Amino acid sequence: MTADKDKDKDKEKDRDRDRDREREKRDKARESENSRPRRSCTLEGGAKNYAESDHSEDEDNDNNSATAEESTKKNKKKPPKKKSRYERTDTGEITSYITEDDVVYRPGDCVYIESRRPNTPYFICSIQDFKLVHNSQACCRSPTPALCDPPACSLPVASQPPQHLSEAGRGPVGSKRDHLLMNVKWYYRQSEVPDSVYQHLVQDRHNENDSGRELVITDPVIKNRELFISDYVDTYHAAALRGKCNISHFSDIFAAREFKARVDSFFYILGYNPETRRLNSTQGEIRVGPSHQAKLPDLQPFPSPDGDTVTQHEELVWMPGVNDCDLLMYLRAARSMAAFAGMCDGGSTEDGCVAASRDDTTLNALNTLHESGYDAGKALQRLVKKPVPKLIEKCWTEDEVKRFVKGLRQYGKNFFRIRKELLPNKETGELITFYYYWKKTPEAASSRAHRRHRRQAVFRRIKTRTASTPVNTPSRPPSSEFLDLSSASEDDFDSEDSEQELKGYACRHCFTTTSKDWHHGGRENILLCTDCRIHFKKYGELPPIEKPVDPPPFMFKPVKEEDDGLSGKHSMRTRRSRGSMSTLRSGRKKQPASPDGRTSPINEDIRSSGRNSPSAASTSSNDSKAETVKKSAKKVKEEASSPLKSNKRQREKVASDTEEADRTSSKKTKTQEISRPNSPSEGEGESSDSRSVNDEGSSDPKDIDQDNRSTSPSIPSPQDNESDSDSSAQQQMLQAQPPALQAPTGVTPAPSSAPPGTPQLPTPGPTPSATAVPPQGSPTASQAPNQPQAPTAPVPHTHIQQAPALHPQRPPSPHPPPHPSPHPPLQPLTGSAGQPSAPSHAQPPLHGQGPPGPHSLQAGPLLQHPGPPQPFGLPPQASQGQAPLGTSPAAAYPHTSLQLPASQSALQSQQPPREQPLPPAPLAMPHIKPPPTTPIPQLPAPQAHKHPPHLSGPSPFSMNANLPPPPALKPLSSLSTHHPPSAHPPPLQLMPQSQPLPSSPAQPPGLTQSQNLPPPPASHPPTGLHQVAPQPPFAQHPFVPGGPPPITPPTCPSTSTPPAGPGTSAQPPCSGAAASGGSIAGGSSCPLPTVQIKEEALDDAEEPESPPPPPRSPSPEPTVVDTPSHASQSARFYKHLDRGYNSCARTDLYFMPLAGSKLAKKREEAIEKAKREAEQKAREEREREKEKEKEREREREREREAERAAKASSSAHEGRLSDPQLSGPGHMRPSFEPPPTTIAAVPPYIGPDTPALRTLSEYARPHVMSPTNRNHPFYMPLNPTDPLLAYHMPGLYNVDPTIRERELREREIREREIRERELRERMKPGFEVKPPELDPLHPAANPMEHFARHSALTIPPTAGPHPFASFHPGLNPLERERLALAGPQLRPEMSYPDRLAAERIHAERMASLTSDPLARLQMFNVTPHHHQHSHIHSHLHLHQQDPLHQGSAGPVHPLVDPLTAGPHLARFPYPPGTLPNPLLGQPPHEHEMLRHPVFGTPYPRDLPGAIPPPMSAAHQLQAMHAQSAELQRLAMEQQWLHGHPHMHGGHLPSQEDYYSRLKKEGDKQL
């Protein structure tokens, strides 16, 4: 046993020795590493322990010293340098820390702390104190102040578990394992505060700014210097220090005007609490403590002139002269009384103690003492009666408490609102008092108002604490988040050559090629020089560039996303990152934040990929270093190629999206979104259109790095949202896209070197990177000259803008974020592709094909025309659009071929608005492959160059992304081909099929119908083909660079592809084999089906990715197999068609549920239900038919009756009904039908009926009085006897009867039945008429409505004008319009004379029927002899003037039968008295009397306008007799035609009595 023990001891010693040796080696290695440049970190990691990165403090301090200057010499041995050290007092307190650069840090200093992520700036804090953490032995115990070497920092900053300490402690005293820590108090940058909080602050500041001067924060530089102080303290390594800064405090934003943005200077005004996520001043926190209390001097009142003391009106509540001892005794007595009372109430001694110890009890006792004049005896006697004041909770009922809590939840601590809405019986002060009581109760814990906005802060922190760490809330990432600092250049400096390789680098911001070192940094993780990076780290923004320099020749155009630090992307993004930034500090491990700090889960995969440099997202040093170190040529190439791989997946993905229409549109936004480096894209980005040429390349995103380095020319493909978990794919896409791609549209900053107006064609370098540039001699180069003003050198990156996908920011929602720049965000291809604001005067050359070859990269750049935004935000093509047809049609015909998958835009519209308004520079690609589902028909190339004349609007592709998604498209037939000059023509494929585009006169008509289009001449292969024309891998989607879209033959099956966005053109999907893979290049293209746009919801779910198929030739013809291919418990899949290795889930497989399965039952039920519904519908249909048949029969019967009556009666009163009724609101009785609804007299709008459109159509209709509405012939004078005719004529001659007729017919049918029934009843002998009451309040419907419905109205040709015809007194304006609109609809097919004749005949019939007095009386069962009796009766009473006048309301007109005004036989025919008579509502106006046929001339038709001379008494009697008959006839007519029960309420008893009396009189013998 002892031997074993000895062996074990020996082994342990050996292990210890080995450990010591390794330690020494590591120390040496660290010292040698000190000479290396600082390594930047590309990790996404959250809060990881600093110590895990195993960096020594020396290294950290060395690498980033006070000013963060990194050492520049690589691998050169240096003389040993000074080490960092610290000073201690004799008490052991560390007073200062001195770095190797002699920067001295002391407690109280404000400093930068390394954030360890290249895309986040340094953290800023103030040092509270230093402490040394080591094992039991102290580093230095000397009693005198001493300088000590600080320990190495490989132990946790504040969070390593204890066992590390014990391991580390084995070293000697002062061992490197000891470490120097510091407690720091954080300042938060504006970008680290949650966006919502900061936005509220900005809003408040602007609202409160009444000074008339701009706030200091309008200057972006100063805005970025504002910090928010916090009380949160963390412990960090001294090694994380990166320099000192100065922080000033200002009392408010106005005082901050004095701040000068000097180097390393910041200011703060407010505090920020990361726990509650609130700013101190904005949300009303309670501030207690000396720092928040005002220091008030003692009051020194002015002597008042009138001798009153200033305190006269104040209430004295306490006099301080009481003896303390007496006071204490009194209070004890009071409390003991309260305790006794409490014990009695509660039943336990605890209750008594609680009652005694309450503040309320003490307060009550003191108040009572004061009120008792400081007589303790009296006070105690009073207290006996009420020793304990009523508790606050007892003053509130349960219901009030509930309402209070509800109010708190609803309105927060807005007590005024709570009182107003819920507790009006309480005072606001009571609410506040109760709140402070309530908030301490247990139920308050779940109801506190602010918790709604809080996250559980405690659990956010992942730090484990060591015993030495103070228990304070960490709010920054534990210092050890620093982790691996691998950088692009980490290992490359190991060799001497690496120094030379550095010369190939250039800063992507300032373009300098000289720098101490190169690291990725900035919000976009681009390659930066030391100065730019340090500036970003300190101030959170890249430095402004005062004198832009040209990018070095070897860079195409730098992938520069940051224009100036101020206006670049990040300036808009910084706030977006706020939420997650603050969490960074608090160590919360949210998702790794994206470069802009966002942490939404969606971002997660892009997050890593969102950087723009090849290595940005790779965590391992290998990836990153390998890429950036490549020679510049390779580098450029990589940039071009990196996006390729990720595209592959998308490409196929789209192919699998069979719901091409909506889906494509939904994808669109997605692709776009990713094309912003940090856009939160959905997990699967699906690019809808780009196909990269490198099909054979590996599609695994992990291979992209290698592929990028490969030398084969690769093309940048539009960035498809490939969201593979390995994010490097995207990152590369974005970052590596040749700068050309990044051609910043107005929003993405363009290389500052590019003067805005000049196209910046990057000079193609010797490297293969000039991927898309066809050799100048190549056939395509010949096309370029066609474009006027286009730079002749083909633009290297002929990138087609990935149509909508590139509308980088098509507003996802109808409220598009405004684009900061004047130009449409897209313009990717602008002639200069790089012009930041390409004014669109230079037409981008049509990039032609390169020599055909498997990778002819030049394949199809379609032109994008940038331009200043047009009224719609569409960039006008200033020069292009207006290019005369003569100028190279191709040039002005921007994109006919590039059909974007409609889907993309649709998606955009449904995506929630993204938080980053900045579109990343659109990536463009030479080949954009339209998604397989929406092939673009190919046209022969020669035609492709025809310039359609009406394409003069900017191409839809360059459409401004700001446009909200277009409303659902109506069927194409309704699209007009005439576009206002400023609007885009609809995407070509959307033109109404019936109109061949004028642009291609040469196009043979049969072209579009033929299935085999002649293949385009080899010299201009259609740009859409990805490879040589004969075998394009995806030929089914060729694009034609500029051909007019084929007119789709009507014979093709119409497929529906909704074009979903301004930028998308719907392409008819090819059907059959062509869609699934047939090569069109070979010459066959599927007949283009008519494009029908299906209006579908835009929110189809996205299809999952499908693996990219290998590039291939057309699939074999399908063979029918019908074999089961897969079975599950409930269903079986059958393979219907076999296409070899290619298959289409939609057409080749079908799915059969097994009998008895739930699915089968569901389907059976659905079929049953459908059958039942169909039967029900059929039954209803049959019933409706029967009803219609009956109605037709009734109508025929009625017409026969009317004819018989017309023959029987005389036609003497021909135009009776066209004579006006008495005027006045009461006289115009409602017609027998309810007034027709207002129906447009304009051709109906065929399309979705919406209230808004309906309202607009009403507004658009000419007014009734408008001369344009005068539809009747002008030579036809209006009948002077009918004041309404003026209003009625326009409706009378309207010739679009369809809608109105249908409605009128239906209503007539319904009402005719009712009328008929009543009429039959009335015609029965012995039926006693009880006419419905006349409605005195009804607004007098048009007396001619009857004729309006029967399309007949006599228009006497001879009548002269009447002064009152145009403004009838009894008609309100709405009624006039209604009458005009409801006018009779004459059948359009009748000629004008026929129409007049028909009107006249019909009027005669109706008049003869309705004006026959006998017929009328019979209708009411009033016999003729009674009629006679009534006349005699009237004669008998002729002279009883006085009694007759008693009931009349006013004098009688001389021409009116005096009896008509009198009570007895008013003959209108209503009983006497003040009956509210609708026929005589007011005494008629004189003019009306003269105009009325009864009181005017006997034959107004023959003697227009003449008033007869005074008549003799006999004549007068005769006239009265006639009038009586006439009036009775009129009344009867009114009753018959207009008195309808459903229009009026109950009967007027007076009418009823009158008619029954009339009938009884008729039954008497005369």
Swiss-Prot record:
Cross-link Glycyl lysine isopeptide (Lys-Gly) (interchain with G-Cter in SUMO2): residue positions: 560, 637
Q: Which GO terms describe its biological process?
A: branching morphogenesis of a nerve; cerebellar granule cell precursor proliferation; cerebellar Purkinje cell layer maturation; chromatin remodeling; dendrite morphogenesis; radial glia guided migration of Purkinje cell
- Zinc fingers (GATA-type): give the ranges: 507-532
Composition bias, Low complexity:
479-488, 609-623, 726-751, 778-796, 843-865, 897-913, 970-980, 1053-1085
> Spans of biased composition, class Polar residues?
465-474, 709-720, 829-840
Q: Which residues carry this modification: Phosphotyrosine?
A: 1259
Task: Please list the residues that carry the modification Phosphoserine.
Answer: 53, 56, 142, 304, 594, 600, 613, 642, 656, 675, 679, 1106, 1113, 1115, 1266
Bias class Basic residues marks the residues at 74-85
Q: Which residues carry this modification: N6-acetyllysine?
A: 1158
Coiled coil regions in record: 1156-1211
Q: Which CDD domains does this one have?
A: BAH_MTA, SANT_MTA3_like, ZnF_GATA
Any idea what job this protein has?
A: Plays a role as a transcriptional repressor during development. May play a role in the control of cell survival. Overexpression of RERE recruits BAX to the nucleus particularly to POD and triggers caspase-3 activation, leading to cell death.
Could you give the domain comment from the record? The interaction with ATN1 is mediated by the coiled coil domain.
Q: Which disease is it linked to?
A: A chromosomal aberration involving RERE is found in the neuroblastoma cell line NGP. Translocation t(1;15)(p36.2;q24).
**What is the name of this protein?**
Arginine-glutamic acid dipeptide repeats protein
